[in-house]
């Protein structure tokens, strides 16, 4: 005798096979309503709401309960496709403990270009040792247990989320004839972003995929560029759930380093596209998480290596430093700094190092210093090569410095400090 429940509410297929309606049955979201069955024929009726009815075909009256059994029926394979952004649940249910000699399985399938995330919401099985010889949950890649085993679990310590390498997963729950516990509950969902990725190179893109990200997402990206360079993030699109400035629901976090223990540069949500964000070193770490409720189109981020100096810098403190970074500056840069100190004060420049491409009139690469707030002010000097005054003074409380390079030779660059006089 066999009952088949087919649930096609989320964007992948979920199938359960069972002959014990108390212990191996689908949880809510979607809810399965068991109307009882006889040994004749079962018709599965799909609803557009969150309820799926398994309707028995009987000859008058309510069907009698099935005879008691302790194992699930043989596996089968069905496919269903629906909209994204939802999660489902399965496992042992009921108010008591699971039975001895259970043998239940579930096959879960996502669309061809997606992967699955399995999350243990609870786990309480008999524990013997780390090999789980008694009661256990086995999880495999693929549609059956011939696929790569991703893990075998027992006891009470739930593992980290399990991510499939393909678009399907196979889960088997098996118990022996002795001790019983309270079972387990698994949540499954589509991985809409790329889970954990380390990205190398000087440019590229990453972000969520599809028309909307899913619930319960936990994704991260580590971006690493060559030594001496920095990472710049440019947001091509951005739309997450928003509630307030603290982003309590769905959020994107950006860290100035190689992991989430680095300095946090920002927590982002809502639909206002953020400004470009730059790292101070060669790595940046980005995490995205979503909750159980609303989903939105997500984000797409372009990363690149910026010019070795800041594109625009306004320096307003009484002292500071600025210049190129790395072993050599980049070609085709145009960078500038505006220094403004207190009224009735002057800017004092101190040249610590200076080495840029040389040309008689500094037509290739050059550093130009202006006696005012912008490049329309009178020019104090235009410099290249390795020759420059080691000390310069403004005529007022502002000074503007512009660095420009062409497309050919590169040099170590410069580093300048300023104080107030």
Curated annotation (Swiss-Prot):
Pfam families with a match to the protein in the record: CUB
Signal peptide: 1-24
Disulfide-bonded cysteines: 72-104, 132-154, 193-219, 247-269, 309-335, 362-384
Biological process terms in GO annotation: chitin localization; extracellular matrix organization
Record key words, sorted: Disulfide bond, Repeat, Signal
Keyword Hydrolase: no
CUB domain segment(s): 72-191, 193-306, 309-421
Tissue-specific expression: Detected in vestimentum and trunk but not in opisthosome or obturaculum. In the vestimentum, expression is restricted to epithelial cells under apical cuticular plaques.
Keyword Lipid biosynthesis carried by entry: no
Origin: domain of life: Eukaryota
Protein function: May play a role in protein-protein interactions during tube assembly.
Protein name: Exoskeleton protein RP43
Organism: Riftia pachyptila (Vent tube worm)
């Amino acid at each position: 005798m066999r009952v088949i429940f087919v649930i096609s509410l989320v964007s992948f297929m979920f199938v359960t096979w069972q002959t014990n309606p108390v212990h191996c049955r689908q949880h809510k979201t979607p809810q399965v309503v068991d109307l009882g069955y006889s040994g004749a024929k079962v018709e599965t009726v799909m609803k557009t709401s969150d309820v799926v009815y398994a309707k028995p075909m009987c000859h008058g009256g309510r069907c009698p309960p099935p005879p008691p059994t302790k194992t699930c029926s043989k596996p089968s394979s069905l496919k269903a496709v629906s909209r994204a952004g939802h999660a489902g649940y399965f496992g042992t249910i009921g108010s008591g403990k699971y039975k001895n000699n259970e043998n239940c399985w579930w096959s879960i399938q996502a669309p061809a270009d997606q992967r699955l995330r399995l999350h243990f919401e609870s786990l309480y099985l008999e524990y013997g040792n780390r090999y789980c010889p008694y009661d256990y949950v086995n999880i495999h890649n693929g549609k059956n247990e011939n696929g790569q085993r991703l893990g075998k679990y027992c006891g009470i310590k739930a593992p980290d989320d399990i991510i499939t390498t393909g678009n399907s997963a196979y889960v088997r729950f098996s118990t022996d004839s002795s001790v019983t516990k309270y079972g387990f509950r698994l949540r499954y969902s589509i991985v809409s972003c790329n889970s954990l990725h380390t990205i190398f190179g000087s440019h590229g893109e990453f972000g969520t995929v599809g028309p909307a990200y899913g619930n319960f997402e936990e994704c991260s990206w580590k971006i690493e560029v060559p030594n001496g360079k920095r990472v710049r993030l440019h947001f091509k699109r951005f739309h997450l759930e928003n509630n307030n400035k603290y982003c309590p629901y769905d959020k994107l976090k950006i860290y100035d380093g190689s992991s989430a223990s680095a300095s946090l540069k920002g927590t982002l949500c809502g639909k206002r596209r953020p400004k470009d964000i730059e790292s101070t070193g060669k790595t940046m770490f980005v995490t995205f998480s979503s909750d159980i409720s609303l989903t939105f189109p997500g984000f797409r981020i372009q990363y690149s290596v910026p010019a070795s100096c800041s594109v625009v810098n306004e320096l307003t403190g009484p002292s500071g430093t600025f210049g190129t970074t790395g072993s050599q500056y980049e070609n085709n840069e145009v960078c500038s700094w505006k220094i403004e100190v207190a009224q009735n004060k002057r800017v004092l420049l101190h040249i610590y190092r200076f080495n840029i491409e040389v040309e008689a009139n500094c037509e290739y690469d050059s550093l130009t210093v202006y006696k005012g707030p912008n490049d329309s002010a009178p020019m104090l000097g235009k410099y290249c090569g390795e020759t420059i005054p080691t000390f310069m003074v403004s005529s007022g409380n502002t000074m503007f410095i512009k660095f420009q390079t062409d497309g050919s030779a590169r040099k170590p660059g410069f580093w300048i400090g300023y104080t107030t006089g």
